[in-house]
Amino acid sequence: MRLVLLGPPGAGKGTQAAILSEKLGIPHISTGDLFRANIGEGTPLGIEAKQYIDAGKLVPTDVTARMVQSRLAEADAAEGFLLDGFPRTVEQADILADLLDKAGNPLDGVINYQVSEDVVVERMLSRGRADDNEETIRTRLGVYRDETAPLISHYGDKIINIEAEGSVEDINARTLEALGK
């Protein structure tokens, strides 16, 4: 299965992806992990991305897309993947669709983890990270809403909405049921 994971910060995407990866036998591909790996290994894409990050700029879509393309070409992703952190915009969704269509492997679905803002704030504050305060969290949620609302419309019938409140186990059971697993 080739799946994209969507959901606001604090929705539990990373937690669910780790469980789903094991249960479905497909890799969890996080763009954050890709950036860290490419920068850490000093790959040409990592060097290029680091220049933007060091300058306090967003890494351009084409650089991120090339990292994703390279990772999707690896053997363990041949039978499917869970993609987390890309796409974030309709432009990126179109780029991903082109990459997958050229490989003859279109996307199977888009899991959209839905959770209330208050639950997200509570979860993120309980993590105890220094940069997690309520104002910062609500700002991040606003950015997510602005970027992702068009993406959810764009994907239309590929969207699989999952209610992401409750225990990790309950959310995972709902996800697997929605995927027919």
Swiss-Prot record:
Query: Per the record, which residues fall in region LID?
Result: 126-132
GO molecular function terms noted in the UniProt entry: adenylate kinase activity; ATP binding
Q: Name one GO cellular component term.
A: cytoplasm
Q: Where does AMP bind?
A: 31, 36, 57-59, 85-88, 92, 129, 140
Known partners and oligomeric status: Monomer.
NCBIfam families membership: PRK00279.1-3 (NF001381), PRK14527.1 (NF011100), PRK14531.1 (NF011104)
About its domains, the entry says:
Consists of three domains, a large central CORE domain and two small peripheral domains, NMPbind and LID, which undergo movements during catalysis. The LID domain closes over the site of phosphoryl transfer upon ATP binding. Assembling and dissambling the active center during each catalytic cycle provides an effective means to prevent ATP hydrolysis.
Tell me what this protein is called.
Answer: Adenylate kinase
UniProt lists the gene as adk
